From Swiss-Prot:
Catalyzes the last two steps in the biosynthesis of 5-methylaminomethyl-2-thiouridine (mnm(5)s(2)U) at the wobble position (U34) in tRNA. Catalyzes the FAD-dependent demodification of cmnm(5)s(2)U34 to nm(5)s(2)U34, followed by the transfer of a methyl group from S-adenosyl-L-methionine to nm(5)s(2)U34, to form mnm(5)s(2)U34. Residues 1-275 are annotated as: tRNA (mnm(5)s(2)U34)-methyltransferase. It comes from the Bacteria. PANTHER family: SARCOSINE DEHYDROGENASE-RELATED (PTHR13847), TRNA 5-METHYLAMINOMETHYL-2-THIOURIDINE BIOSYNTHESIS BIFUNCTIONAL PROTEIN MNMC (PTHR13847:SF283). GO terms for molecular function: flavin adenine dinucleotide binding; oxidoreductase activity, acting on the CH-NH group of donors; tRNA (5-methylaminomethyl-2-thiouridylate)(34)-methyltransferase activity. The keyword Transcription does not apply. One of its GO terms (cellular component) is cytoplasm. Its EC number is 2.1.1.61, 1.5.-.-. One of its GO terms (biological process) is tRNA wobble uridine modification. This is tRNA 5-methylaminomethyl-2-thiouridine biosynthesis bifunctional protein MnmC. The lineage of its organism: Bacteria, Pseudomonadati, Pseudomonadota, Gammaproteobacteria, Alteromonadales. Keywords: Cytoplasm, FAD, Flavoprotein, Methyltransferase, Multifunctional enzyme, Oxidoreductase, S-adenosyl-L-methionine, Transferase, tRNA processing. Its main location: cytoplasm.
C-alpha cells in the first residue's frame, strides 16, 4: 500500500517574499534571454577532452528566478554535441525547494513566454531540491549536465570548496540582485576556483562589480539590454586582464588552501579512458562508483566474489532510506541530507530509465521501491527525549522532516501508532540489490565496463606504480587506480587491514503480510524498523552484533526483532500479526566507523604515518612542531589505492554520493562536497584527528 496524502508541509514563504529573494531575470524577452545564453556559450574556451569528453565548468552568483540557468541547460541539451558535458555551480545564500520554485514560476508566469524551458524546469522540480545548507548535486541526461546548488552563506560556500586544477570554473555569471554582496574577499575566492583566463559576465554590471573583478584578475563582459534585443556587437569585454601579479596571487591563494588541507590528500594520478579503474566489490557502493565513472566516460572493471551483484550487505529485500539528523545539524547531519537526496534522485533516474528501456533492453533491472515516507518514533523515555531534541533544536525544512502528532501518525501509517513522531516525507524503502544491478546496467550503456563474477580477490600488490589483483591463480592488471569497495572484506588485505572500522552482523526478518499489518503504508523506525509489504512480505529488523561468531540464521535474533516492535508499539493489535515462525530472514555484515561517516578517498599508508609519528613525537617540546608538521604536510598515502566503505546501516543514503565524490576525485572534476565534509570522510581521519591536535596515538 501507499500512504494516504499526509498533511501539507508547512512552507513559510509566500510569493511576495519569494520574488523579493529571487527576483525576475533581467532579460525581459525570450529572444534576449536566448541571445545572452548563446553569447555566454560563444565566450567559453574549449577545455581539454579528458576521457574523450569536454567538460565545461561554469559558475553562477545567485539563482534569481532561475531563467538564466534554465536557458543555459536547455541550450546545452539541444545545441551542443553529445561528447560535451556541462557542470554549473550555483551559489545562492537563500535555500529554496521545489515547491517554492514551482510557486515562483507559476505566479510570475515566467515560463509562459519561454515554453521551450518547461521540460528542463520540470526536470529540476522532479529532482526535488531542498532548503538545506550545503551542495545538492543534480544530474541530468546520463551525466551530460550537472548542476551543483550551493545553498547558504556565500563566503562559507566559496572558501570551503576545493579547487579543481584539471577542471576550474571557466566563466561566472553575476546576477544583479546579489551584486551588492560581492566583496574583495569573495572575488578572490571566486578567482581561486577559476581558470586564469576565466571571465565574469553580467547584464548591466555595476562599475563596482567590474572593479572588484578586475582587481582579482577577471576579465569582464558587461552586456547591455539593448545589445541583446538587437545587434549583440556591443557585448564586448570591457577589460581583458592579463596582469601577471594578479595571476600569481591566485596561484598563491590556491597553494595556501591546499596546504591548509594537506592532511586530506588528493589523487596524484587522474583516470584515463584507456586505463580502466579496478573496483573490488559487488554491492551498492561499487555499482554506484561504476555508474558515476561511466557518466564521465571512464571505463572500469569490477571484481565480485559472488555470482551476481548485491549478495553482501546490499542483499536485503528492502532497506529504509532517509537522512540521519542530529540536534546540532553538524557535518554528519548535513552530509546525510545531501547524500539522501542524491541517492533518491539516482533511484528516480534509474527507475525512469528502466521504464523507457524495458522493451528495447529487457536486461535492464527494475528497482523495487516506494517513497512512502519514514515515520520515526521513540520507543522508551531516553529515545523519546533524543528525538524531541532533534525535532526542537532546528527549524528543519518540511521536505526533510516535520513533527506529527499521534493522530497524524496514525493517518500516515494507516495502522495504529498512537504516539507523536517525526516524519520524513521524501524517505521510504528500496531494494538494495536491484538498485546495484540497475546502476551497473546503466553504466554498461554509457562506457566500457567489465564485471568478473565468482572472482574473489585474495591479494593485491603494487609493482612499478601499478596495482595487480590475484584470484585463484589468476593475476589481473596492471591498474593505475584500484578502489576497495568490498564491504565486509574491506580489511582483508595488508594494505587495508589497519583501517579503523568494525564489522557488525545484522539479521533482517521476513514476515508475511496479513491482517492489519498488511495495511502499513510507511516505513516505521523506532527500536528497529518495519517496512510496508513487498511481494507479500515485510522486512523487520535488524540485529546489531559486533564480532559475531557466525553468520547463520539465529532464532534468538529473530525473536529480538519481534521484541523491538513489541517494545516500540505496545498494545497495538497489528503487532500481534507479526509472524516470525517461518524463520525467514537474511544475515548480512555492515562495516561501521565510530563517527558514522563512510570512508571515501585515498588509502592511507598507515605504516608510514606511524613511522613519521615516532619521528616527530619524541617529547613534549617537539609536540607543537609535530602538530604543525601534520597540518602542513601531505598525509602519506598508498598511491593509486582508494577506499570506499564503512557505509554502516545507512548505505542506501550515503553510498551513492560517496561514490560520486570519489569518481570526481579520480577524474579531477569539481566535487559536490566541501573541505569540512571531505575531512570527515577521509580514511586516515582516525589517526590524523589526533595528530593534528598534537595528541599521542
Amino acid at each position: 500500500m501507499t500512504a494516504k496524502p499526509h498533511k501539507s508541509c508547512q512552507f513559510k514563504r509566500d510569493y511576495p517574499q519569494l520574488i523579493n529573494l529571487y527576483p525576475p531575470c533581467a532579460l525581459t524577452t525570450a529572444q534576449s534571454l536566448d541571445n545572452f545564453t548563446r553569447l555566454r556559450r560563444s565566450r567559453l574556451t574549449t577545455p581539454s577532452a579528458q576521457l574523450g569528453q569536454e567538460l565545461y565548468v561554469m559558475g553562477q552568483w545567485g539563482l534569481g528566478d532561475g531563467l538564466e540557468l534554465l536557458s543555459l541547460l536547455h541550450h546545452w541539451q539541444t545545441q551542443t554535441q553529445s561528447n560535451t558535458r556541462l557542470l554549473v555551480k550555483v551559489f545562492e545564500p537563500n535555500p529554496i525547494n521545489d515547491y517554492e520554485l514551482k510557486l515562483l514560476w507559476d505566479q510570475s508566469q515566467s515560463l509562459i513566454s519561454t515554453p521551450h524551458l518547461q521540460p528542463i524546469a520540470n526536470a529540476i522540480l522532479k529532482a526535488k531540491p531542498a532548503r538545506i545548507i550545503g551542495c545538492q548535486r543534480l544530474i541530468f541526461d546520463d551525466g551530460r549536465i550537472t548542476v551543483d546548488l550551493h545553498f547558504g552563506d556565500l563566503h562559507t560556500s566559496l572558501t570551503n570548496l576545493p579547487h579543481s586544477p584539471a577542471h576550474p570554473i571557466q566563466q561566472w555569471l553575476v546576477l544583479p540582485h546579489l551584486a551588492s554582496q560581492l566583496s574583495g574577499k569573495l572575488a578572490w575566492q571566486m578567482a581561486r576556483l577559476s581558470a586564469d583566463d576565466a571571465q565574469l559576465i553580467g547584464v548591466n554590471l555595476a562599475e563596482t562589480v567590474q572593479q572588484l573583478a578586475h582587481s582579482s584578475g577577471f576579465s569582464t563582459l558587461n552586456v547591455s539590454q539593448d545589445a541583446l534585443n538587437g545587434d549583440a556587437s556591443d557585448a564586448l569585454p570591457s577589460q581583458i586582464i592579463t596582469d601577471e601579479i594578479l595571476l600569481h596571487e591566485r596561484k598563491l591563494l590556491r597553494q595556501q588552501a591546499d596546504t591548509a588541507q594537506a592532511f586530506t590528500p588528493k589523487p596524484a594520478t587522474l583516470a584515463a579512458i584507456d586505463h580502466p579503474v579496478a573496483i573490488v566489490g559487488g554491492g551498492l557502493a561499487s555499482a554506484n562508483l561504476m555508474l558515476s565513472l561511466a557518466e564521465r566516460g571512464q571505463s572500469s572493471t569490477l571484481f565480485c566474489k559472488d555470482n551476481e551483484l548485491g549478495q553482501g550487505a546490499s542483499g536485503n529485500r528492502q532497506g529504509a532510506i532517509y537522512p540521519l539528523l542530529t540536534p546540532e545539524n553538524d557535518e554528519l547531519s548535513r552530509f546525510f541530507q545531501q547524500a539522501f537526496l542524491f541517492s533518491r534522485r539516482r533511484i528516480e533516474a534509474l527507475s525512469q530509465a528502466s521504464m523507457m528501456d524495458t522493451n528495447a533492453a529487457p536486461h535492464v533491472t527494475v528497482i523495487s521501491h516506494d517513497f512512502c515516507g519514514v515515520l520515526q518514533t521513540g520507543h522508551d523515555e531516553r529515545s523519546q527525549q533524543r528525538l524531541d531534541k532533534i525535532i526542537q533544536s532546528q527549524d528543519w525544512p518540511a521536505e526533510i522532516a516535520y513533527a506529527v502528532d499521534a493522530n497524524e501518525a496514525n493517518e500516515i501509517a494507516q495502522i495504529g501508532i498512537d504516539k507523536a513522531g517525526f516524519f520524513y516525507p521524501l524517505g521510504g524503502w528500496v531494494c538494495p540489490f536491484e538498485y546495484a544491478k540497475a546502476a551497473v546496467d546503466k553504466a554498461s550503456q554509457l562506457a566500457n565496463v567489465q564485471c568478473h563474477f565468482n572472482t574473489e580477490i585474495t591479494e593485491i600488490e603494487c609493482d612499478a606504480q601499478a596495482w595487480y589483483l590475484h584470484s585463484q591463480g589468476q593475476r589481473f592488471g596492471p591498474f593505475r587506480q584500484l578502489v576497495l569497495a568490498n564491504g565486509a572484506q574491506l580489511t582483508q588485505f595488508s594494505a587495508s587491514e589497519r583501517l579503523q572500522i568494525s564489522p557488525f552482523r545484522g539479521q533482517v526478518s521476513h514476515v508475511p503480510a496479513q491482517f492489519k499489518l498488511s495495511q502499513l503504508a510507511t516505513v516505521l523506525c523506532a527500536n528497529g524498523y518495519l517496512t510496508p509489504s513487498h511481494q507479500g512480505l515485510h522486512c523487520l529488523g535488524a540485529s546489531y552484533v559486533k564480532a559475531a561468531e557466525h553468520f547463520d540464521f539465529c532464532p534468538q535474533e529473530q525473536r529480538e526483532n519481534l521484541g523491538k516492535m513489541q517494545e516500540s508499539y505496545p498494545n497495538q493489535a497489528w503487532v500481534d500479526d507479526i509472524d516470525i515462525s517461518g524463520n525467514s530472514a537474511r544475515v548480512g555484515v555492515r562495516m561501521v566507523t565510530r563517527d558514522h561517516f563512510p570512508m571515501m578517498g585515498c588509502a592511507p599508508d598507515v605504516a608510514e604515518i606511524l613511522a613519521r609519528y615516532e619521528l616527530h613525537q619524541l617529547n613534549q617540546q617537539q609536540a607543537e612542531q609535530s602538530k604543525h608538521y601534520w597540518q602542513t604536510t601531505p598525509a602519506p598515502i598508498l598511491d593509486g589505492l582508494y577506499i570506499l566503505g564503512g557505509l554502516g546501516s545507512r548505505g542506501l543514503s550515503s553510498g551513492p554520493l560517496a561514490a560520486e565524490c570519489l569518481a570526481a576525485q579520480l577524474t579531477g572534476e569539481p566535487l559536490p562536497l566541501d573541505w569540512s565534509t571531505l575531512n570527515k570522510l577521509n580514511p586516515n581521519r582516525m589517526w590524523l584527528r589526533k595528530l593534528l591536535k598534537g595528541k599521542a596515538l
